[in-house]
Amino acid sequence: MKIDVNQFLKPCSCGRKHEIVVDDIIIDSGAINQLPEILKRPAYADKKSLVMICDENTYEAAGKQVEALVPGLKKIVLDPDNLHANEHGVEAAKKGLDEIGNVDMMIAVGSGTVHDITRFHAYAMKIPFFSVPTAASVDGFVSTVAAMTWHGFKKSFTAVSPVVVIADTDIFKKAPLRLTASGVSDL
């Protein structure tokens, strides 16, 4: 199922105008296989230095597939033990980004934590990112805010939404039930 993002450009009941920067939302069985074709589109074809940010669990869940589909993809695989959307998670990803050097675009492969860390860096680096969620565990995949715990305090950082979301239902089906349940309660 391809979502027509233009349907979200209608006036909002809150009276405010909300900007939509997501070009594509694809939710389907096997959706991940569309990644190579999407990357060939004119808006992304010039992106030569792509980096995937994931953790060890999400690498197994979908990162290996992304890596196989995108030749030359560099990766940052974070340690999932005690990984949180906080200054430590941000610093771990930054270390990997610094080691890689030039980056044109990122691909977040994971759920809320990985997405918040990725969107934080994409905003700071002024580059786009793609979203490949591995579980329907949060409702904020297209958020423009990185919700973090910073030095022990909850804080919302201005960030960017992904330009493309590729939500593969075959991957979601394999996610732990507790993650899906947390997504239902996040709504």
Show which residues each predicted segment covers.
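A generic local secondary-structure boundary/capping motif
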Residues: 41, 119-120, 152-157
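A glycine/threonine-rich phosphate-anchoring loop and its flanking beta-alpha core
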Residues: 125-187
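Short beta-strand/turn micro-motifs composed of small residues
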Residues: 53-54, 110, 167
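A short, small-residue-rich loop immediately preceding and capping a beta-strand
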Residues: 99-135
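ATP/NTP phosphate-donor binding region
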Residues: 1-105, 182-185
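Glycine-/small-residue-rich active-site loops that bind phosphorylated ligands and cofactors
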Residues: 58, 81-85, 113, 136, ...
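Short glycine-/acidic-enriched loop or helix-start segments at secondary-structure transitions
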Residues: 62-64, 117-119, 141-142, 176-177
